[in-house]
Amino acid sequence: MLSAPTPMHTVSSQASPTQQARCLLVLLPGFSDSDTDFDQHGFIADIHARKLSVDTISANATIGYYAKRTILGRIETDVLAPMRAKRYEQTWFMGISMGGLGTILVAQQHEKELTGLILMAPYLGDDDVIDEIAKAGGVAKWKPPAVVDPEDYQREVWRWLKHATANPTTSPAIYLASGDQDPLARGHRLLATAVQDGHLFRTRGNHDWGPWRTLWANFLDTSDFRTRCAP
């Protein structure tokens, strides 16, 4: 049976022991990963090494929460609600693979609260949805269904991505990072045509932690996240 404990387990890390950081970064793991993997694979250390003003929360948003459709409720109750009282200047979400999908789902409900989304090798839907958008000529030309259907979550994810990329000044910034041999690359290539200049990060590699660590370092070193979350 898929597990979805209440409350959702989280692991926090602070930039400073004496003062709150400017930015909050929430990290959502992939299908077979957990909240501790970000620390084990050096993602948190990479932030500290660059002396960024970033506090992090790694959420154990495993597949059970998605299957039971409690992911958004738990993120709201166990992550966002406690953090609102702290009044961070900026709130960012980063998700890997399935966590990338989760990040978009959160953004659909909390668009005005979020500063940016970092989608690393995100799952963006099954082949039929990707084929449909590709045949339409890409995200900009694709026409979503006339009626919003929460049950058709994959097309609703792309409806939001189409809206957000077409309205970058009023939507959270979207950053896309992926390996060139990733099995989910078809969806990544579609989204890549719509993201802003400077928001696309590519490297050699497949769907695993090696290229993800490289992409993460590149993002931290070259994106405007570094200046936005400077001390």
Regions found by a protein language model. Name each.
Residues 1-231:
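Non-catalytic cap/lid and distal C-terminal segments of serine-dependent acyl enzymes
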